[in-house]
Swiss-Prot record:
Pathway: Purine metabolism; 7-cyano-7-deazaguanine biosynthesis. InterPro entries: QueC (IPR018317), Rossmann-like_a/b/a_fold (IPR014729). CDD domains: QueC-like (cd01995). Its cofactor is Zn(2+). It is an enzyme of class 6 (ligase). This is 7-cyano-7-deazaguanine synthase. It catalyses: 7-carboxy-7-deazaguanine + NH4(+) + ATP = 7-cyano-7-deazaguanine + ADP + phosphate + H2O + H(+). It comes from Rickettsia felis (strain ATCC VR-1525 / URRWXCal2) (Rickettsia azadi). Belongs to the QueC family. Catalyzes the ATP-dependent conversion of 7-carboxy-7-deazaguanine (CDG) to 7-cyano-7-deazaguanine (preQ(0)). Gene3D superfamilies: HUPs. Zn(2+) binds at residues 189, 199, 202, 205. SUPFAM superfamilies: Adenine nucleotide alpha hydrolases-like.
Length: 224
């Protein structure tokens, strides 16, 4: 069975990717990060999520991106923006963008893949996020893959899989539902309460709620 490293945050996108990788028959080696993020609820959710899958290993990597901040997710002095309607959502890079986060995460995944002999890495980026998050662009993924194949000692090519890349958020949710993803064990909120209730009006919550609405399905998680 082929091995794959799956980046799993605890959000809806990475949960869908996890289900896709399982459907493709990979031996799953999951990797999550505690990077000092405001939303530690992600890590609690991901531990529940992976119980539903035949995960060979689950690594939680501890790094502290609060060391340089620059994002509302890693600097408590920067407020998470809240909105009233999806039409108010920003079209440029928001303060919730974490500088170089996907580069850091993919670099760790690459190192892990090299150690276990995996030639496939999965990440849940998609182009509907690319206007807000520059490290979700297809050209970024292509460039990272090229770098990875210059930088490692595996021998055969590393492939960075982005199965959601051309999907809108509602398509991602639809795909996950078809694959049996239990979205109850996910959280997308940038600013959850201490008891893991989603705020319902940050950028991530608004996009998520809109996606479930377009699928005529109620989001199974709890909101404030």
């Amino acid at each position: 069975m082929k091995k794959a490293v799956i980046l799993v945050s605890g959000g809806a996108d990475s949960a869908t990717v996890l289900a896709i990788a399982r459907e493709m028959g990979y031996e799953i080696h999951a990797m999550s990060f505690n990077y000092g993020q405001r939303n530690n609820a992600e890590l609690r959710k991901v531990k529940e999520l992976i119980k539903e899958y035949n995960v060979k290993q689950h690594k939680i990597v501890y790094i502290d991106l609060r060391a340089f901040g620059g994002s509302a997710l890693t600097d408590n002095n920067i407020d998470v923006p809240h909105y009233h309607d999806v039409n108010e959502l920003p079209e440029d890079v928001p303060v919730t963008y974490v500088p170089a986060r996907n580069t850091i995460f993919l670099s760790y995944a690459l190192g892990y893949a090299e150690v276990i002999g995996a030639k496939d890495i999965f990440i849940g980026v998609h182009t509907s996020d690319s206007a807000n998050y520059p490290d979700c662009r297809p050209e970024y993924i292509k460039s990272f893959e090229e770098m990875a194949n210059l930088a490692t000692n595996i021998g055969n090519r590393i492939t960075i899989h982005t199965p959601l890349i051309d999907m809108a958020k509602e398509q991602i949710i639809k795909t996950g539902l078809e694959l049996g993803v239990d979205y109850k064990n996910t959280i997308s909120c940038y600013d959850p309460t201490e008891d893991d209730l989603s705020c319902g009006n940050c950028l991530a919550c608004m996009i998520r709620l809109d996606a479930f609405k377009k699928n005529n399905v109620q989001d199974p998680i709890n909101y404030v």
